[in-house]
A protein has these predicted regions:
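Short amphipathic alpha-helical segments embedded in low-complexity Lys/Glu-rich regions
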Residues: 111-114, 160-161, 193-194, 468-470, ...
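Conserved positions within tandem-repeat grammars
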Residues: 683-684, 689, 693, 707, ...
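Conserved PLP-enzyme active-site core in the AAT-like
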Residues: 115-125, 129-380
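Non-catalytic terminal extensions of PLP-dependent enzymes
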Residues: 1-81, 90, 98, 243-273, ...
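Short acidic-aromatic active-site loops that bind/stabilize oxyanions
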Residues: 78-89, 105-109, 195, 199, ...
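Intrinsically disordered, low-complexity tandem-repeat regions
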Residues: 682, 698, 702, 711, ...
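General small-molecule cofactor/ligand-binding pocket signal
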Residues: 106, 152-154, 462
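Short loop-beta-helix segment that forms the pyridoxal 5′-phosphate
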Residues: 97-119
Length: 730
């Protein structure tokens, strides 16, 4: 027994020592202690331009000398190059890959905005189709523009009562993929990008999303923006819904001989009847293990939720085809977006942050969750606070249809219920996010944030909506900081209570009107109105919604193509039947996502939303001029260049059939069997061997009511004489 204890002791020490290693930080620290002569760049190196100054010595007093002793541009002498790492920096990235469960990890010193652009440029070529959450960070939109992608925007479910979006339902994703398949464009679909978790804490079932998408498009690449989710790897419940853990689990399942056997048995049991799209959308699909490729990327803002200096981020890769297909393009994209003068302090902090979570991450994240739950309890159980504000529950932010577990408050009903919800529900809520509904205070979210929390008490938050503010606990949150926040909220509520009691009748009426607007009136969030036909792709057997953002973006570089119109002027032109097309991104804060992108047509819903939003910060909108839009002449010019008629359609290429050449109706008609279009074979329509031609669905889990579907139901049996009918409904 003593021998066993000794082996255990030595194993633990070995594991701790391996995790404690910080190759780049240690190399930088050692380098900083060497005497050097700088005959190159960086006068600030070792603080020499500061300590010898008459006027800026206080910089050393504030920051300390060590940070300047470690400031260097050297890439040798024990250090390394971020662009071509071969030494300690390479080792640090390998250790990060082990800690985060990836096959490759890369450090980024300009935030996840740059990380997203690197991954997008590495994977997407001009003309590739990308499925993108419209409610994503602006870096994705700009990345699509730089890559020349044709973007299909995915709609998240709206939360109109709180003027925010949730997440993109799996049904929405599948419907877009199936539409692209029908149009014969599935071979051009390259990537899908989603945000997990969302800013407001809504978490996807990552493995299921990838599983069902790969059943339709077996080589689809996934980019998961985990800017706010880096910490999730280090908690056993959270981890199951991270990109890297889900990629590994899916890969192992696809390689499991039992899975392959069950898949083959299910194929043999399929019928030849082809299911409708509605059937496919309602059923759980699984991929063919012989064809599916697990290709997953995650970008994380380490500095947002873990220990790192600002702008410290990471790219994690789990891609079966990385070495064959992506390594070289990724290197070029990394070179294109990475500075040749990276900040070594940021890189060292990423190394140290990895050490911390590798050794104590589980403890820190558990404490983070506990602090969040204490904050929820303190707010909701305080009689005065609950009068003016409340923490939104899972049932407030995730509609019932996405919660098969039917647990309305899994965060408060015990660990077993929380795990059940995380195992079954399409979306779950991150316990460390607290969305505080403040409508009864009469304050809108932005005013509450600035005038009350930040200006008066120094409470820092970021995300607000029309009637809510978001609090997030992190691994640095302490119990005393939670207690201070509760005290601040109580002070605000107490002052408000007193002010209301002393209001005149007129003031009271004004206050009640403000409360009514914030609590009873909802602000309808507009759907994506669509790209103008001049920027759409018109190939394929039927219309699909993807648009060329890059072409629309660069058209505005010639200012003669643009003009400014006010909302009222746009209304008048819409009344006259004229399409008005945005020349730029229009992004109000809050909510912080582009309401308009280049090439998108204005709608009345968008204009009304912008009028009702009541926010002073709108990027892409100039109050004195209005919206920057394309002139009618510019749109006509682009339309003519791609062969569109004035009404936005391509001229028909069909020749009128001679009157004497009447034919009998084709046997295989449209949806109702009565069409008389000419027959078109499968290979003529979408080409042979299209990805996704062999879809299948697994038998659902025992606790699921989702029916089965397999290959033959999904694409139909290859019966002699079968032909695919062209659809001209669009």
């Amino acid at each position: 027994a003593r021998e066993g204890m000794l082996e255990l002791h030595l194993s633990i020490l070995h594991g701790v020592a391996a995790r404690y290693r910080t190759p780049f930080f240690s190399a930088l620290k050692e380098y900083s202690h060497r005497p050097t002569g700088v005959f190159h760049a960086l006068p600030i190196s070792q603080g020499k331009s500061i300590v010898n100054s008459h006027w800026i010595r206080d910089m050393v007093g504030f920051y300390g000398l060590d940070v300047f002793m470690a400031e260097t541009s050297a890439t040798c002498g024990g250090l390394d190059s971020l662009l071509e790492p071969t030494g300690p920096l390479r080792e640090s990235q390998q250790l990060a890959a082990q800690a985060y469960g990836s096959r490759h990890t890369y450090f980024v010193t300009n935030g996840t905005s740059t990380a997203n652009k690197i991954v997008t440029q590495a994977l997407v070529a001009p003309g590739d189709i990308v499925l993108l959450d419209r409610n994503c960070h602006q870096s994705h939109h700009y990345g699509m523009m730089l890559a020349g992608a044709n973007v299909v925007y995915l709609e998240a479910y709206p939360l109109n009562d709180y003027s925010m979006y949730g997440a993109v339902p799996l049904r929405e994703i599948k419907s877009k993929l199936l539409a692209l398949k029908r149009a014969g464009k599935l071979d051009r679909v390259k990537m899908m990008s989603l945000t997990n978790c969302t800013f407001d804490g809504i978490v996807y079932d990552v493995e299921r999303v990838m599983e069902e998408c790969l059943a339709i498009k077996p080589d689809l690449v996934f980019l998961w923006d985990e800017a706010w989710f880096a910490f999730a790897r280090f908690h056993p419940v959270y981890r199951t819904r991270t990109a890297m853990a889900s990629a590994r689990a899916l890969r192992e399942r696809l390689q499991d001989p039992d899975y392959k056997r069950r898949f083959e048995e299910h194929l043999a049991a399929e019928t030849a009847e082809e299911p409708s799209d509605d059937d496919l959308l309602a059923r759980r699909l699984i991929p063919d293990p012989a064809r599916a490729r697990v290709r997953v990327y995650a970008t994380q803002s380490t500095h947002k939720t873990l220990t790192a200096l600002r702008q410290g981020s990471m790219i994690h890769v789990f891609d079966q085809d990385y070495d064959q297909k992506v390594a070289e393009p990724f290197h070029e994209a990394y070179m294109a977006h990475t500075s040749t003068s990276p900040n070594y302090q940021i890189l060292a902090s990423l190394d140290l942050g990895r050490r911390q979570v590798a050794l104590e991450g589980v403890e820190l994240v558990q404490r983070q969750i506990e602090n969040a739950m204490q904050l929820r309890d303190a707010i909701d159980n305080h009689p005065l606070l609950s009068k003016y504000m409340r923490c939104l529950r899972t049932s407030d932010l995730i509609p019932e249809g996405f919660r098969p577990s039917a647990i309305s408050q899994p965060l408060r009903s015990g660990l077993r219920n929380m795990m059940a919800a995380w195992d079954q529900d399409e979306f779950v809520l991150d316990p460390s996010r607290i969305t505080l509904f403040i409508g009864p205070t009469g304050y809108d979210g932005d005013t509450f944030k600035r005038q009350q929390l930040m200006d008066r008490y120094g409470i820092q938050i970021n995300k607000t909506s029309r009637n809510s503010v978001l609090f997030m606990t992190n691994i640095g949150t302490t119990r005393s900081s939670v207690a201070f926040l509760v005290e601040v909220l109580v002070n605000i509520a107490r002052e408000l209570d007193q002010d209301i009691s002393e209001m005149s009748l007129g003031e009271r009426e004004h206050f009640e009107q403000a409360v009514y607007r914030l609590t009873e009136m909802s602000l309808v969030l507009p759907d994506f109105s669509g790209f103008h036909p001049a920027f759409r792709d018109h190939s394929g057997s039927e219309a699909t919604p993807e648009g060329d953002v890059r072409r629309a973006f660069y058209l505005s570089y010639d200012d003669t193509n643009c003009q400014y119109l006010t909302g009222e002027q746009i209304d008048e032109r819409l009344d006259a039947g004229v399409d008005i097309v945005s020349a730029t991104y229009v992004t109000p804060y809050p909510p912080g996502f582009p309401v308009l992108v280049p090439g998108q047509v204005f709608s009345r819903e968008i204009l009304q939303f912008m009028r009702d939003l009541d926010t002073p910060e709108i990027h892409g909108y100039r109050p004195n001029f209005g919206y920057r839009v394309y002139t009618e002449k510019a749109i006509e010019m682009v339309s003519e260049s791609i062969g569109l008629t004035p009404n936005g359609h391509r001229p028909s290429r069909r020749k009128a059939a001679p009157k004497t050449a009447k034919k009998k109706p084709a046997k295989h008609g449209g949806a109702n069997g009565e069409g008389n279009l000419p027959e078109v074979g499968h290979d003529e329509l979408i080409g042979p061997n299209q990805p996704g031609d062999a879809l299948a669905a697994a038998p659902p889990p025992a606790d699921s009511a989702v029916p089965e579907v397999g290959v033959e139901e999904l694409i139909g049996g290859q019966q002699p004489g079968d032909a695919v009918q062209a659809d001209n409904s669009s």
